[in-house]
Amino acid sequence: SLDGAHAPWCDAEHRDIVNLKKSEFWNKGGPAWQKIVVCLVFDGIDPCDKNTLDLLATVGIYQDGVMKKDVDGKDTVVHIFEYTTQLSVTPNQQLIRPNDNDSTSLPPVQMIFCLKQKNSKKINSHRWLFNGFGRILNPEVCILLDAGTKPGPKSLMALWEAFYNDKDLGGACGEIHAMLGRGGVFGRKLLNPLVAA
């Protein structure tokens, strides 16, 4: 899922993977960016943040006008959009475009956006990812991130490498810690044991 904010860490991580020259996997059978698919699963149209949908429309992955509530008299269960983009948006709402003269420019990002018509909870979203898209894409590794999660630098690459280097590995998780923000506003609140819990 996506929480509505641009993820510069994701752009940097994707760029690092695409520019990786050491690995046979990333340089075999086509460009590295073609081996990565970002799949966004949103749990229901009504609870979805409209600003997030606007952001996704800006980068090209979402089109409001093509959705139908029903098809041939049957209620729509999910709306699926697929797009490859090289656009991104910063937290300050600035559009970032690729620059051919810059090696740190944005590589293409293949995206699938699954917008469920109704809120049917997290397990149903996981089913869409694994049973729906996973069967078609047949990925080597899936990394799940909840909305609002901000991975550290190189953390996605470290997870991928763990799976790639150990074929017996079935699952892994990263370390989670609270980000207290600037100015200690949240830090002061954590002094209250009820809030901290």
Swiss-Prot record:
Record's catalysed reaction(s): [(1->4)-N-acetyl-beta-D-glucosaminyl](n) + UDP-N-acetyl-alpha-D-glucosamine = [(1->4)-N-acetyl-beta-D-glucosaminyl](n+1) + UDP + H(+)
GO biological process: cell wall organization; chitin biosynthetic process
Role this protein plays: Polymerizes chitin, a structural polymer of the cell wall and septum, by transferring the sugar moiety of UDP-GlcNAc to the non-reducing end of the growing chitin polymer.
Coarse class of the protein's main subcellular location: membrane
The organism's taxonomic lineage, starting at the top: Eukaryota, Fungi, Dikarya, Ascomycota, Pezizomycotina
Keyword match Transferase: yes
GO-annotated cellular components: cell septum; plasma membrane
Class of this enzyme: transferase
Membrane topology: Multi-pass membrane protein
Protein name: Chitin synthase 3
EC number(s) given by UniProt: 2.4.1.16
Keywords in alphabetical order: Cell membrane, Cell wall biogenesis/degradation, Glycosyltransferase, Membrane, Transferase, Transmembrane
Family assignment from sequence similarity: Belongs to the chitin synthase family. Class III subfamily.
GO molecular function per UniProt: chitin synthase activity
Regions annotated as coiled coil: none
Pfam families to which the protein is assigned, alphabetical: Chitin_synth_1 (PF01644)
